[in-house]
Amino acid sequence: MSLLSIFGCGRAKTPEYPADRLSARDGTEFTITFFKHASLAISVGGKYIYVDPVSANADYGALPKADVVLITHSHYDHLDVAAVEKLLAADTEILCDRTSAEAFEMNCYTMRPGSVATPRDYVKVEAVAAYNTTPGHLQFHPREREDCGYVLTIGGTRIYIAGDTEPTPELKAL
């Protein structure tokens, strides 16, 4: 028996993460893959949208390149520039909140609550307010920071990405 047969072929296997395969209202199929904490990916027809990529949550160098990257806010557990850089292709679109935009030395589209963007023909992105309302948490996500959650529309189906937020009046409108 050779060492290769005992230990495999010598290549690391890409880790598998929990994923849900869904169909949008118009029949478009998409998959939501959860990595950890706030990091996830949505794949639509071989295109990938990554949300809050953080290196501690996934091996982004082993994953497909991003079509779109969404960043909700600049805290370390939601924004990791090194992870984003591993996902970049020549035409990757990065959408992020105002404070995260300051962390990038690359082009990104700054989103504020109320902003709407269509970075690709298969997805519309609406930025919604994400802030804390309870006294013990106000210092982490004050409303004036303009942190973002996102509502993605894919094939007529809306997907809410919360970011870090608590119940707010804006959530009732969703």
What does each model-found stretch correspond to?
Residues 81-82, 106, 137-138:
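Short, conserved acidic/polar surface loops in the N-terminal third of protein domains
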Residues 85-86, 90-94, 98-126:
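Non-globular, low-confidence helical/coil segments that flank catalytic cores
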Residues 3, 7, 12-64, 110-173:
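Core dinuclear metal-dependent hydrolase active-site scaffold
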Residues 55-100:
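Active-site metal-binding motif and surrounding structural segment of the metallo-beta-lactamase
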Residues 95, 99-102, 166-174:
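Cap/insert and terminal regions of metallo-dependent hydrolase folds
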